Amino acid sequence: MGMDEAMRMNRLFKLDQFNYPRFRGKIIDLYLHAFTSGEYAQYIDPRTAGTTLDALVRKGWGNMVFVGDRLAGVAMAMSLQHDRDFPAAELPAIAVERSLYISEVMVHADYRGRGIARQMVDDLLARAVDTFTDVVIRVWDKNLPALALYHKLGFYPVASIRQTKLEAPGRPFEMRKIYLHRSIRSAD
């Protein structure tokens, strides 16, 4: 089965403040699975995961992909104005007020490499074209599969920051995050 055929079997739905409560538990489980297990794992307190996701949905919107009845992926986006870490002063060519920030892209390990992240990002960009001119995403520099995908989608690095995260409770480590940018459409 080819990638296009596999993507047609995926069911993509909008995610917003109205349907989020219905899927909140599954989204929290996916968030914890995607970011606390595997090669790129970090520690996230399960008690704060829900609060983090609740805030993201209040500020923006996203989409979900189901394979059968299983939630396989979630992507969330908002105005770049909500990302307090974005180095706007260093990047005056990127108009923060006209830029979409893709804040989360998570795919369950069982479904990685099947085009789900690409499908979700493509959908976010298609839905954003009437409102935003640019899009920015922030990726851990060690997450090479994500960096490769975003490069294929036309993103290029514009800045980096360092964030302190946890390997385990009480064990901090420094993570270098790369901001990637691309145009959605030209400015009016």
Please place each PLM-identified region on the residue numbering.
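Conserved N-terminal entry element of GNAT/NAT acetyltransferase domains
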Residues: 1-29, 33, 187-188
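Helix-loop element at the rim of GNAT/NAT acetyltransferase active sites that forms part
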Residues: 28-44
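Conserved active-site tyrosine of GNAT-family acetyltransferases
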Residues: 31, 150, 155
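Active-site rim helix/loop that mediates acceptor-substrate recognition in acyltransferases
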Residues: 39-67, 76, 82
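Glycine-rich acetyl-CoA-binding "A-motif" of GNAT/NAT acetyltransferases
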Residues: 70-73, 145
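Conserved acyl-donor/pantetheine-binding loop and adjacent beta-alpha core of acyl/acetyltransferases
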Residues: 74-104, 164-171
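Conserved acetyl-CoA-binding loop-helix of GNAT-fold acetyltransferases
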Residues: 107, 113-126, 148-152
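Conserved beta-strand-loop-alpha-helix junction that forms the acyl-donor binding cleft
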Residues: 112, 136-147, 163-174
